[in-house]
Swiss-Prot record:
Residue ranges that the Swiss-Prot or TrEMBL entry lists as coiled coil: none
Keyword Transmembrane helix annotated: yes
Protein induction: Transcription is induced by HWY-289, but not by CI-976. HWY-289 may deplete protein levels causing an increase in transcription.
Record's function text: Sterol O-acyltransferase that catalyzes the formation of stery esters.
Gene: ARE2
Protein name: Sterol O-acyltransferase 2
Amino acid sequence: MGRTNTSDQLNAISDKNTKRKSLALDNEYHNNSSSEDDSSKIELSYTIPDNNNIISQETTTSVEDVLSLSSAPQNELRLRKQKSNNQDSPVDLNGVIVDVSKREKIFLKRKRQIDNKHGSDKSKYLSRFNDITFKAKSSTIFESDEFYKTDFFGMYVLFWLATAFAMVNNLIHTYFENSTPILQWTVVKVFKRDLFKVGLVDLAMYLSTYFAFFVQYACKNGYLSWKKVGWWLQAAFDGLFLFFWLWIASEYCLDFPWIAKVFLVLHSLVFIMKMHSYAFYNGYLWSIYKEGLYSEKYLDKLTNGKVTLPKGHTKNETEKVLQESIAFTKYELEYQSHATTENPDDHHVFDIDQTDKSIAKLQQEGLIKFPQNITLFNYFEYSMFPTLVYTLNFPRTKRIRWSYVFGKTFGIFGLIFLMILIAENNLYPIVLRCEIARKLPVSERIPQYFFLLMDMIPPFLMVYLFTFFLIWDAILNAIAELSKFADRDFYGPWWSCTDFSEFANQWNRCVHKFLLRHVYHSSISAFDVNKQSAAIITFLLSSLVHELVMYVIFGTLRGYLLLFQMSQIPLIIMSRSKFMKDKKVLGNIICWFGFISGPSIICTLYLVF
């Protein structure tokens, strides 16, 4: 290994040791927020140069091969950066010095807080990916014993009984007053059209997601480097994946009906999030794993006198840097291997004695499960789990409750039938009226719009609620039961939320967890923004994706949904004001007003204007 590469390796390790210290004191991701001084955020995933010859390097290194050493302000070893033509070097020491000077006050301020919370053991670290914990919970809110024991359980029963009576009434009138057979309904014909082709396209789309696995498999076998090539390939494939399958479903290719288009675009977004989480989670672990191997090898050479240090610098200083690097990498790999047990410890008490064992030994003992997790079966399992966030250890159930699966399957088809019934008898006639109104002059169209809106709200609200139960309660739980996935945290009590940020967290927990880890926290780390800016970035990305779905449905780009979603930001700010602080009922009323009217307003806007 050349002198420049050796210098870059040691420089990167020293750089990351300093950054991790700041991270541990100032960036607790598990609290779902950034620290008080958001300008000090740093990313843990700074990687060392990827060199497959690190382990097989020559047994001796000249004086020039080793970087000059100097002491840092906190008695930490700091390595001076040398000029290098190696473009893979991740180190910018000038930036590190600036970062450390900014964080010194924060370091001292938070040290007591962290020591009180975690103890004074210096081996305590905070993992980058400790923001999400999977828990073994095989029941949802509506299935829990706590829910059945509440005084409001009868209201849930009343909702479904009232729904049943309304649907039976609708069905009776349809049967006796409408001579058209059910299979000839307009909505049913749209639903059935190209059904077999849609299934084949969806299967092909699923199989293409295995690209993410093969990239990681290539990294595992040394065919390519994640840092140099892998992440570029994955990022490019993610973008290509979305637009390719959108094109396949569009009128320019297979010309699927709008229901099929919506299904495929939503499923493609699910696959993209799953691939992204799998790829970049493992990509982060590659940087940690390779750093640990390098530090072990270099420390062994230093201990055995096979590396000559420059004059004026002690062996102890270099050993301290390497030992700290080894301690953290072993901690991180072990944490990620065991952090999602049934009773997880967010900070994963790390046995300092484990640093005496090599990474290979810890792998043999099962304490480190990376990169052994990169197998075809592991990816297949993950692809079947109803989650968008990858980790090394998911909670599992011991058996499949087939009666539970049957109940959820019956609910899936029942809810689909009810949604078709409402769409055919209530929504479709309004859509036809909207098409007529669309041809009117604007002066006549606006009054008609309000009549259409009022007629649209009741049936659209029912479809809105049925969609929630269909996807998050029926489909996801059925998939979870079949795959023995124990964490059923698919939704929270969104119906009781008092602001729209709480609704965003509770309505779709799967997407929320993905955005929290891979958008919100990554924005703080990568772009050095505060938590408010990161929240806006996350909100904007979510809004753009929703607007894309609207474009697929209506074939026009209007931006109505984007505008309405972004308008939630001032509402969130208002909900957190002193005026709204103790007004939970008013906050819930505002939210429910949005739930009831918002979807109908947006739908009719796209149809009429």
